[in-house]
Swiss-Prot record:
It is found in: Plastid, Chloroplast thylakoid membrane. This is ATP synthase subunit b, chloroplastic. Belongs to the ATPase B chain family. F-type ATPases have 2 components, F(1) - the catalytic core - and F(0) - the membrane proton channel. F(1) has five subunits: alpha(3), beta(3), gamma(1), delta(1), epsilon(1). F(0) has four main subunits: a(1), b(1), b'(1) and c(10-14). The alpha and beta chains form an alternating ring which encloses part of the gamma chain. F(1) is attached to F(0) by a central stalk formed by the gamma and epsilon chains, while a peripheral stalk is formed by the delta, b and b' chains. F(1)F(0) ATP synthase produces ATP from ADP in the presence of a proton or sodium gradient. F-type ATPases consist of two structural domains, F(1) containing the extramembraneous catalytic core and F(0) containing the membrane proton channel, linked together by a central stalk and a peripheral stalk. During catalysis, ATP synthesis in the catalytic domain of F(1) is coupled via a rotary mechanism of the central stalk subunits to proton translocation. Component of the F(0) channel, it forms part of the peripheral stalk, linking F(1) to F(0). The gene is atpF. It is a single-pass membrane protein. The lineage of its organism: Eukaryota, Viridiplantae, Streptophyta, Embryophyta, Tracheophyta. Keywords: ATP synthesis, CF(0), Chloroplast, Hydrogen ion transport, Ion transport, Membrane, Plastid, Thylakoid, Transmembrane, Transmembrane helix, Transport.
Amino acid sequence: MKNVTDSFVSLGHWPSAGSFGFNTDILATNLINLSVVLGVLIFFGKGVLSDLLDNRKQRILNTIRNSEELREGAIEQLEKARARLRKVEIEADEFRVNGYSEIEREKLNLIDSTYKTLEQLENYKNETINFEQQKASNQVRQRVFQQALQGALGTLNSCLNNELHLRTISANIGILAAMKQITD
């Protein structure tokens, strides 16, 4: 803090340069030197500065032109993308509609196929039942026939004695002899 106050105090001790005013001595103020330097700078620097500004202007114009071309290309790509999107949406709607109708058609085909399969299974079941019924009735008939035959044989065996047996044989021989005489 002391250094700050000392610097203000030392400012107060500087010798005064004089009063404020214009110095009219041209050589003392270096106006000629300044004007010569400015003239040389303007004369030689004008071309360089002009070239720099022209180059900068061309770069800016090229950048703007490129930006416009990119913008137009982006707009064109956006329109193409929108057209593709519309086309894809239309195709998706067609696929959706066709898909639903295809699903319905497949569903109906599946139902028809299932009904036909069930009908075939029902027919096969009925044929199997009829076959089994015929087989069972044939077995019953065969069984009844065998039992009747066994019963008849049992009756014949119990009824037949030797005398009846000999008479039956004699009667059959007589029938055969009569048939032979008719045929001769």
